[in-house]
């Protein structure tokens, strides 16, 4: 997996208002989802928002654990995710020519609707020394439709 693909996978990282400590086989990953209900776009198309957040979070946690496995054993990556904007926009199906007035929605994804994520992070070693950190890091994947992440 190339660096762009790994970076793009972080864009999916969303939802839940509490800190989650995810131990891995190598380093440690700590993620805090700061006010996920105020994220720009974590809107479901055809399910409740709460269930969508729960389902999305479960998938993202599993993927983050995979990524954390590449950290050196003595390192800890701490992230505070402050915003998520998923690719595309959710529209009522009748607005785009699908379905009828049954209340279903559809997420329409076009090349210009790129996924974005804003977060702060800190990578520390076993002594607590900060190896790398950044505040309000803005990640976006303009080529998300051209790559196969999984």
Name each region found by the language model.
Residues 20-26:
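Sec/Tat signal peptide C-region and signal peptidase I cleavage site
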Residues 33-86:
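N-terminal segment of the mature soluble domain
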Residues 69-77, 122-133:
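A short, structured loop/turn motif at beta-sheet edges
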Residues 81-126:
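Surface-exposed short loop/turn segments
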Residues 42, 88-91, 144-148:
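Outer-membrane beta-barrel proteins
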Residues 46, 132-150:
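Short secondary-structure boundary motifs at beta->alpha junctions and helix caps
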Residues 1-11:
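Bacterial N-terminal signal peptides that target proteins for export
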